[in-house]
């Protein structure tokens, strides 16, 4: 068990000045118990905490570090920009054009793109744009999907909202809640029923094509195809939230993987290379409704800042040049197979879901295809599993309902260590 003396001291101090002692709820370890760990340094696939303990990292800053932490090319590019260009101007810069052009080349749905500062900003802006473009008010999302902390999305949401045990948030007005309609993931009939009940009122359907905030739940391809057909027939804007799965499950995201093209796409995480960033884009005739071309307002003081764009641009260049996706698939598949073999040895039959280098081990024997099946998972057992892995130097998400990210920086030795630790942790979790 790692000694966490300094982390415990810092957490006590933090609680005096920061609500709950953290700046994002899942970091508080409420669902797994114990002391939140304060990190001091990251390098490659490893993190070191303030007490000097080192961990093999499968959180990767919640997704951005597909190449690992402190990749030398990304770090060098950030340093060059910091020393030679600057941190922010509040004016247009050439880097904005370069990354926008590259994103439009990579992502199938993008004809135009707008940079913002977070995934939440991206999804909020995309929904506002869809409403402005269609002149309709209501949106459809899916139970358990998380699209950031905008008011419209905190109705039956996933991520930290689900981790806290309450999928809705106080502070969301009744009017907002009434305009947010929730369907069942992977169930096209539930979507059709809502559309028929709200004929001519639905502006957009927003979905994570690989849900990553209820654990990991892949959409069925036929479900996404049916959504595309329904949106075309009803004049509804289809939005893929690829903040998490974009550039991770494939270079062009889930829309490349599944071969289904949305009208709008939201992005983040990987395109910031570890710095705060987001983006939304899509069909030109929709994007042209954004100010200053159109009347749908969206703005940001630090949008398109040089540091974030530099980190994202260098990360994308590496992904294009080195094509790590076959190797990422091999590594993630090795872990999946190892975990499965361990469960077979122990007579366990827990559900594993994986798409590329995003994965989740659910402590339930129920196949997990939507929110209702996800919450059959035994969170108490996951808490025991989490702490056993932590004791063995493996850092996982401190919540059953988050993804495990494999990175290009994980070595075969790291993977073998993880499989061995998984066996011990499964034993500990099921005592």
From Swiss-Prot:
Reaction equations catalysed: (S)-4-amino-5-oxopentanoate = 5-aminolevulinate
Which Pfam family, an example, fits this chain? Answer: Aminotran_3
E.C. number, please? 5.4.3.8
Q: Which residues cross the membrane?
A: none
Q: What is its main location?
A: cytoplasm
Q: Which UniProt keywords apply?
A: Chlorophyll biosynthesis, Cytoplasm, Isomerase, Porphyrin biosynthesis, Pyridoxal phosphate
Origin: domain of life = Bacteria
> What cofactors does the UniProt entry give for this protein?
pyridoxal 5'-phosphate
- Which InterPro entries does the annotation name? 4pyrrol_synth_GluAld_NH2Trfase, Aminotrans_3, Aminotrans_3_PPA_site, PyrdxlP-dep_Trfase, PyrdxlP-dep_Trfase_major, PyrdxlP-dep_Trfase_small
Q: Which GO terms describe its biological process?
A: chlorophyll biosynthetic process; protoporphyrinogen IX biosynthetic process
Classification via SUPFAM superfamilies: PLP-dependent transferases
Q: Output the Gene Ontology cellular-component terms.
A: cytoplasm
The molecular function terms of the Gene Ontology recorded here are: glutamate-1-semialdehyde 2,1-aminomutase activity; pyridoxal phosphate binding; transaminase activity
**Cellular compartment(s):** Cytoplasm
Question: Which Gene3D superfamilies does this chain map to?
Answer: Aspartate Aminotransferase, domain 1, Type I PLP-dependent aspartate aminotransferase-like (Major domain)
Subunit composition?
Homodimer.
HAMAP family associated with the record: HemL_aminotrans_3 (MF_00375)
User: Which NCBIfam families has this protein been placed in?
Assistant: hemL, PRK00062.1
What is this protein's record name? Glutamate-1-semialdehyde 2,1-aminomutase
Organism of origin is: Chlorobaculum tepidum (strain ATCC 49652 / DSM 12025 / NBRC 103806 / TLS)
Underlying gene: hemL
